[in-house]
Structure formats: C-alpha cells, structure tokens
Amino acid sequence: MMEDKQYKGTTTIGIICDQGVVLATERRATMGNFIASRDAQKIYRITDNAAMTIAGSVGDGQRLARILQVEAKLFELRRHGSMSINALSMLLSNILAEMRYAPYYVQVLIGGLDKAGPKIYSLDPLGGRIEEEKFVSTGSGSPIAYGVLEDRYKPGMSVEEGVELAARALESAMKRDSASGNGMQFCVITAEKFEIFEREVSKQVINA
C-alpha cells in the first residue's frame, strides 16, 4: 500500500549540468482517477542555492519543505553560512527515517549548487538517500521519462540543454501517464541565478 502511494500521480526530473542543476515537474495533482489540480506546486525553494521536488502526498511534501526551509534558515543565522546540499539531504534523510513507522508518503529530489559543485539527491519515504551522478526521475511517469533521459543525456551539457531535455522527458511522460500533465515547471540553479519558471506543453502532447 505504501509503495502505491509513494509513486502515484506525478513526474519529477533532476539533471546534473555543467554549471548547475535543473529540476522539473509537470503540474497535475490527482486523487485516484480524479484530477484534483491542474496547477499543483511541486518545486519548492529551500535556500538561495537549493530546491526540492515532491512526488506523492502533497500535504506531506509541503510539510517537509517547510521543515527544511526553517532548519536551513536557523543554520544560516547560527553559522553565518548556507547548508551544503549534502547536509540538507542528510537532514531530510534523518527526518524521514525517524518517521519510518508512520512515514511521509513522498519521494523527494533535493538539488542545488555549493562549493562541492552541482548536486542532486533522491530520497525515499523511509529515508533512503542516493546521490545521483547524471539524472533522476520519480513518480508514476518516471519509467517513460527515463527512456528519454538515458537516450539523450550528455555529460557536461549546459543548463539550457538540461531544460530542453527535461521538457522532452516530461512531455513523453504526459503522453502515456494519465496522472501527469497540465504544463511544466522548471528550476534552474547556477552560481549566477536561482530561477523557477513555467512552460506550456506542445500541441503534440495536448492532442495526444
């Protein structure tokens, strides 16, 4: 039962690029076969150099995002510096592990840029944590997205190329996964900028 909730109803993507990271999601939120929202927020800014995506329970994901935002701000005030992406992912891993008997039904990507370079970590509901070296996808549309990512990913690609690849993978997932759709949202994190923006899907997806 937990596994069903864990992977239900979304597609999220993370891509390591030459100068930063790209996170991407579609906008649909579902309750079973019912489309509950067509503009769901699935990317959350944690710090000026880190963000997270959620797949699974929206409420659980929002709560975890708020916890991380507060903890990261407290760290900044006490230590006069930002938490590393590794530290953020370890903190979230510990939070999830402590709740393993009443778990958050959510799968999370944490991505960003720090002194160690661009980093993306994926975390499961029980606190399992993996550092991704190239790209990652979560949610019900991820098996379809992975086909595009594996075929077209190139080491050292720019964030602009990463956005285009993520868009292509999301659109492929939307064509086949009924729980994914209704537009795309992207987060680009580099040393120069933190940007969250939206993009409409192509006509081919709308007419599919």
UniProtKB/Swiss-Prot annotation:
Gene name tied to this protein: psmB
HAMAP family associated with the record: Proteasome_B_A
EC number of this enzyme: 3.4.25.1
Active site: T10 (nucleophile)
Regulation: The formation of the proteasomal ATPase PAN-20S proteasome complex, via the docking of the C-termini of PAN into the intersubunit pockets in the alpha-rings, triggers opening of the gate for substrate entry. Interconversion between the open-gate and close-gate conformations leads to a dynamic regulation of the 20S proteasome proteolysis activity.
Keyword flag Endoplasmic reticulum: no
Main location: cytoplasm
PANTHER family linked: ATP-DEPENDENT PROTEASE SUBUNIT HSLV (PTHR32194:SF0), METALLOPROTEASE TLDD (PTHR32194)
GO cellular component, one term: proteasome core complex, beta-subunit complex
Gene3D superfamilies the record matches: Glutamine Phosphoribosylpyrophosphate, subunit 1, domain 1
GO MF annotations in UniProt: threonine-type endopeptidase activity
Subcellular location: Cytoplasm
Catalyzed reactions: Cleavage of peptide bonds with very broad specificity
NCBIfam families: arc_protsome_B (TIGR03634)
Positions of disulphide bridges: none
The keyword Cytoplasm is annotated on this UniProt entry: yes
Propeptide residue interval(s): 1-9
Function: Component of the proteasome core, a large protease complex with broad specificity involved in protein degradation.
Protein name as it appears in the record: Proteasome subunit beta
Assembly and binders: The 20S proteasome core is composed of 14 alpha and 14 beta subunits that assemble into four stacked heptameric rings, resulting in a barrel-shaped structure. The two inner rings, each composed of seven catalytic beta subunits, are sandwiched by two outer rings, each composed of seven alpha subunits. The catalytic chamber with the active sites is on the inside of the barrel. Has a gated structure, the ends of the cylinder being occluded by the N-termini of the alpha-subunits. Is capped at one or both ends by the proteasome regulatory ATPase, PAN.
UniProt cross-references to Pfam families, sorted A to Z: Proteasome (PF00227)
Family as reported in the entry's similarity comment: Belongs to the peptidase T1B family.
GO biological process, one term: proteasomal protein catabolic process
Keyword line: Autocatalytic cleavage, Cytoplasm, Hydrolase, Protease, Proteasome, Threonine protease, Zymogen
